[in-house]
C-alpha cells in the first residue's frame, strides 16, 4: 500500500491522528496517547494493514514533552509506518504498553523506562534494565544532571 493510501485509511479511523508534513520514505503520524493502544492494535489486526513487525522503539525528550517513536513494518504488504506518541507530564510520564500486541516491545519498553522514565501501563515486568535500581534519574532526558560527570555532552 502506498503512503497516500495508508494515510487515507488511517484518517478514516477518526481518532485524532496527525500526519507529518515532511516527505519521508515512511509515512509518519502522531497519535494522542489515549488512542495509542487502539491504533496499534488496529495496525496489526486490520487485514489491509497487517503491521506484524515492530522493529524499533525509541524514547524521546522533546523538551516540553516525553514520548516514544514506533517503527512498524508489514511483512505481508511490504509497507512501513512511524507512529509517534507523547505526554506533557514529565513528572509521571505514562503511556500504554504495546507488549500485548507485539511481544518484542517488552525489551524496548524496558529500555525507554530505564533511560527516560516513561512508565508503560500493563507491561508484564517494568524495571531497570541497564542501570542499577539505585540509579537516580533518567540519563537520556534533557534535564538530567550528571553529578558524577560520567556523561560528556
Report each predicted region and the residues it spans.
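Terminal low-complexity/charged segments
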Residues: 1-153
Amino acid at each position: 500500500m502506498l503512503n497516500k493510501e495508508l494515510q487515507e485509511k488511517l484518517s478514516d479511523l477518526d481518532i485524532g491522528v496527525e500526519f507529518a508534513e515532511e516527505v519521508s520514505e515512511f509515512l509518519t503520524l502522531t497519535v494522542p496517547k489515549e488512542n495509542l493502544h487502539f491504533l496499534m492494535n488496529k495496525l496489526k489486526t486490520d487485514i489491509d494493514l497487517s503491521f506484524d513487525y515492530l522493529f524499533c522503539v525509541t524514547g524521546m525528550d522533546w523538551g516540553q514533552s516525553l514520548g516514544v517513536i514506533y517503527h512498524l513494518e508489514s511483512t505481508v504488504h511490504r509497507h512501513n509506518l512511524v507512529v509517534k506518541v507523547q505526554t506533557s507530564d514529565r513528572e509521571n510520564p505514562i503511556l500504554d504498553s504495546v507488549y500485548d500486541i507485539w511481544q518484542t516491545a517488552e525489551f524496548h519498553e524496558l529500555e525507554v523506562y530505564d533511560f527516560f522514565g516513561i512508565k508503560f501501563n500493563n507491561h508484564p515486568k517494568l524495571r531497570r534494565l541497564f542501570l542499577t535500581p539505585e540509579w537516580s534519574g533518567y540519563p537520556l532526558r534533557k534535564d538530567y544532571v550528571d553529578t558524577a560527570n560520567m556523561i560528556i555532552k
